[in-house]
């Protein structure tokens, strides 16, 4: 019985220390504006978003949702996947609309707006697509015509 109690205490303390280590990693990453690392370090954790660590997780998740679209654009571009790269930028605009209320709730509008600005600047500079045109493309309900329009943009038509 004593062995089981000691074993249980060791496992419990190991889990607590492990969780604290992940939370410290998340805190450091948040202050370094590395939202992907925060997301990875806190993935699966049930944290109260009214407390410090939960708030860091919630803020980072909101920012990371749009940031990963821009990161996806850069990754696809490096891999020569031009259509997927353009689609990632457009999905970033759609993501912005989806996360807007949460960004306001958690006080991260400035960070989200900065990523949106990067996306819009890239759309304009690389594809000659402004926000109005981007929203028209996003709202195209037909997958085939959407893809055709992306091909036309890539080819300069």
PLM feature segments, named:
Residues 36-87:
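Extracytoplasmic/periplasmic/luminal assembly and interaction segments
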